[in-house]
């Protein structure tokens, strides 16, 4: 088995999908989890206005609405959380995403004050954060807020991770990578677009340039610029296609380098890091 085949198998990626079937699969998956643990009453997700959170948010709201109808439990709710750092440049996209999702509840937590307070506390301890590390601080503060909300609403935090993100480890460890349940796992980027199109999402929300937008020195830095490969490259790789060797090597390099992000904390019994 080649490394490409191993990666595809590990991430559950498929070359072709039926969007309607995958929508149903994700919704039923979320419903089944909540039914298994009836003390859970909410799904919580941060909404950024990008493709991934828009899709995960819509699937979460669909799952909650169906489960509420089936069980008669009106305590069930989907909570969409806006988590700007100060003023968000693409705020209108966030509002458009919320209008499309139609969540039961919308909360806004501006993380800037918390991030600056943490940065100042570290500075007083003699640690000056780089712009890159400050970006990770933002991602972790956002997740901290979501877990606080979930803790107070008997909820679970929904993640937006998918195969095209997992393969490169393009997420912050214990930030946006630290979630409870990931309904998009297995899908690549273009497949996520197919699901949103099938759901009637406004095109500009899934055709916009993907960006984590965490760094102050490089605002709205495109994911593809940071990775050195395009999402089309990554999707082709996950679909089993043959790529230029340099591109394939870059993708595989990211996968190996970020293996620790896809695992629980390393123990004495782990040996993947010795490769």
Curated annotation (Swiss-Prot):
Please state the Enzyme Commission number of this protein: 6.3.1.5
Q: Where does ATP bind?
A: 46-53, 160, 189, 211
Keywords from the UniProt entry: ATP-binding, Ligase, Magnesium, Metal-binding, NAD, Nucleotide-binding
Named in its record, the pathway it takes part in is: Cofactor biosynthesis; NAD(+) biosynthesis; NAD(+) from deamido-NAD(+) (ammonia route): step 1/1
List of residues binding deamido-NAD(+)? 140, 173, 180, 260-261
What are its GO biological-process terms? NAD biosynthetic process
A single GO cellular-component term from the record reads: cytoplasm
- GO molecular function annotations of the record: ATP binding; glutaminase activity; metal ion binding; NAD+ synthase (glutamine-hydrolyzing) activity; NAD+ synthase activity
- Isomerase as a keyword of this entry, yes or no, is no
As its record notes, the protein acts as a catalyst of: deamido-NAD(+) + NH4(+) + ATP = AMP + diphosphate + NAD(+) + H(+)
Q: Does the keyword Cell division apply?
A: no
Q: Which InterPro entries match?
A: NAD/GMP_synthase (IPR022310), NAD_synthase (IPR003694), NH(3)-dep_NAD(+)_synth (IPR022926), Rossmann-like_a/b/a_fold (IPR014729)
Query: Which residues make up the binding site for Mg(2+)?
Result: 52, 165
Q: What does this protein do?
A: Catalyzes the ATP-dependent amidation of deamido-NAD to form NAD. Uses ammonia as a nitrogen source.
Record-linked PANTHER family:
NH 3 /GLUTAMINE-DEPENDENT NAD + SYNTHETASE, NH(3)-DEPENDENT NAD(+) SYNTHETASE
Question: What HAMAP family does this protein map onto?
Answer: NadE_ammonia_dep
Oligomer status and interactors: Homodimer.
Question: What family does this belong to?
Answer: Belongs to the NAD synthetase family.
Name of this chain's protein: NH(3)-dependent NAD(+) synthetase
Organism per entry: Salmonella paratyphi B (strain ATCC BAA-1250 / SPB7)
**What lineage does UniProt assign to this protein's organism?**
Bacteria, Pseudomonadati, Pseudomonadota, Gammaproteobacteria, Enterobacterales
The gene name on file is: nadE
């Amino acid at each position: 088995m080649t490394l490409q085949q191993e990666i595809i198998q590990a991430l559950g990626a498929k070359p072709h999908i039926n969007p309607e079937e995958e929508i149903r699969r994700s919704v039923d998956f979320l419903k089944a989890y909540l039914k298994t643990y009836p003390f859970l009453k909410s799904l919580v997700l941060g909404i950024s206005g990008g493709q991934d959170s828009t899709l995960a948010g819509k699937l979460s709201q669909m799952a909650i609405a169906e489960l509420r109808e089936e069980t008669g439990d009106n305590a069930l709710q989907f909570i969409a959380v806006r988590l700007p750092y100060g003023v968000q440049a693409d705020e209108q996209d966030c509002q458009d995403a919320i209008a499309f999702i139609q969540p039961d509840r919308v909360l806004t937590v501006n993380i800037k004050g918390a991030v600056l307070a943490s940065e100042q506390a570290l500075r007083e301890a003699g640690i000056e954060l780089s712009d890159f590390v400050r970006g990770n601080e933002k991602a972790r503060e956002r997740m901290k807020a979501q877990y606080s909300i979930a803790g107070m609403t008997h909820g679970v935090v929904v993640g937006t991770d998918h195969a095209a993100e997992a393969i490169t480890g393009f997420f912050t460890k214990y930030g946006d990578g630290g979630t409870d349940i990931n309904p998009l796992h297995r899908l690549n980027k273009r497949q996520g677009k197919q699901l949103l199109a099938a759901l009637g999402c406004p095109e500009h929300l899934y055709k916009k340039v993907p960006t984590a937008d965490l760094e102050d020195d490089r605002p709205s830095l495109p994911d593809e610029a940071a990775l050195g490969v395009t999402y089309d490259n990554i999707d082709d790789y996950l679909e089993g296609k043959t790529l230029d060797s340099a591109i394939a090597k870059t993708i595989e390099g990211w996968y190996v380098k970020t293996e620790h992000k896809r695992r629980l904390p390393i123990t004495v019994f782990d040996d993947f890091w010795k490769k």
